[in-house]
Amino acid sequence: LARELNLGQILQIYDNILAQRICGPSGRPVKIEMFAHGALCMGISGKCYLSLHECGESANRGACRQICRRSYELRDRDTGETIAVEGRYLLSPKDLCTIPFLDRFIEAGVRVLKIEGRARSAEYVKRVVETYDEALRAIEEGTYSPERAAVWTERLAEVFNRGFWGGYYQGAPVVELSANYGSSATVRKVYVGKITNFFKKIGVAEIQVCLLYTSPSPRDMR
């Protein structure tokens, strides 16, 4: 369903599915799928034509150039006055994160979570998927808590992100904008190589090492 919905609206749709017995080809009630985590388009649901207009690459065909992530100023055509929103990127929303209210998300009837991970690293995908899997298991076991949700959110913040917010699901009236052009990850990594193959039977990985050489300073050579 659309990311502009709030939890109350999602629950109403879920209740109607059950009340009206709206079923899929399997004969079982259709499941509600919602975006749960990842980058948000300035158009929220992705119907954006900025990339197509400026670069000839359509976001609606999976080829977005993400020029909305750049820094922009707002100019008044009548007066020519320029307004800069300090510390914010006007067209770049923060990333969606539903971990802090995932229990309410599930209570509203959401049964399939969609994670936005286009052009993200394997590390990003692994971290996000395993974190949400752990949170869902905690909800199922009755051990989900705000304290654990805070720990999971910190874990998610270690990989690529533009800051987090809960989207419109909790009734936010306006979008929260990112304060950075790139990643706001709390942990910096050094790229040392790429795993090119893994031989499962013998437990051996083949790694292409990428070494970056920098000349030592005179102080280092003393």
Label the predicted regions.
Residues 111-120:
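Short acidic/histidine-rich active-site segments
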Residues 188-189, 199-201:
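Short flexible coil/turn linkers enriched for glycine and charged/polar residues
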Residues 200, 206-212:
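A structural micro-motif recognizing beta-strand termini
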Residues 1-111, 125-128, 135:
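Catalytic alpha/beta core domains of metabolic enzymes, predominantly
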Residues 213, 220-222:
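Single conserved hydrophobic/aromatic residue that forms the stacking wall/gate
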